[in-house]
């Protein structure tokens, strides 16, 4: 029986805009930003930030060297926020409904302090922080490890007190989904901003039928 549902953030809960992020970083001076940015797993100082190896201030300092001028924290925040297109209300309502139905619902995300600064303020445009929608959040920069490493999935499963076979993992990153499936989780891999509600309902209904049989 499924008891635990883990959601990725970018591309699943919120709609991503990779091109907007590229433009924002170019605007602050990172001319080759497309080479540095990724939609699923960051590298270089971007990956170091999201894996908790460096702080937000370290990132600001390192990026300042890369662009050849002193950047402010606000400029870094604005650039990172370029990844956010919008937060579909349908997703938030579906997540709250899953919790009301008794599922444990958590966030499992490769993210960083700049993104969470925004998400912890007013995630839905109605004054609710992102934590309002989840039972727990497992963030790469706090866990000190990024998906698709097994360790971050283990941290999530321990925190949720759930087995892999009791868990559905929803992520738009194919490598992340493959890693979760290899551990025994049921997985969904929607495209960025795809409506995943019917797909998830089908997985949950299928598992419920299996448990009855």
Task: Report each predicted region and the residues it spans.
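A structural alpha-helix within SAM-dependent methyltransferase catalytic domains
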Residues: 96-99, 157
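A generic structural motif
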Residues: 102-104, 185
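Anion (oxyanion) recognition and catalysis
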Residues: 99-100, 181
């Amino acid at each position: 029986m499924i008891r635990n549902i883990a959601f990725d953030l970018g591309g699943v809960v919120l709609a991503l805009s990779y091109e907007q992020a590229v433009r924002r970083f170019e605007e602050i001076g990172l001319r080759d930003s497309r080479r540095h940015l990724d939609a699923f797993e960051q590298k270089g100082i971007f990956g170091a930030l999201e894996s908790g190896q460096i702080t937000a201030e370290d990132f600001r300092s390192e990026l300042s060297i890369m662009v050849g001028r002193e950047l402010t924290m606000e400029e870094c925040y604005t650039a990172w926020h370029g990844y956010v297109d919008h937060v579909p209300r349908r997703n938030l309502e579906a997540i709250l409904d899953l919790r009301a139905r008794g599922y444990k619902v958590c966030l499992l995300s490769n993210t960083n302090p700049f993104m969470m600064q925004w998400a912890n303020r007013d995630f839905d445009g109605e004054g609710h922080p992102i934590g309002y929608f989840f039972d727990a959040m497992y963030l790469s920069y706090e866990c000190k490890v990024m998906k698709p490493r097994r360790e971050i999935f283990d941290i999530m499963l321990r925190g949720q007190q759930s087995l892999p076979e009791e868990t559905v993992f929803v992520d738009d990153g194919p490598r992340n989904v493959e890693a979760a499936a290899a551990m025994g989780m049921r997985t969904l891999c929607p495209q960025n901003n795809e409506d995943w509600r019917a797909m998830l309902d089908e997985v949950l209904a299928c598992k419920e039928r299996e448990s009855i049989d």
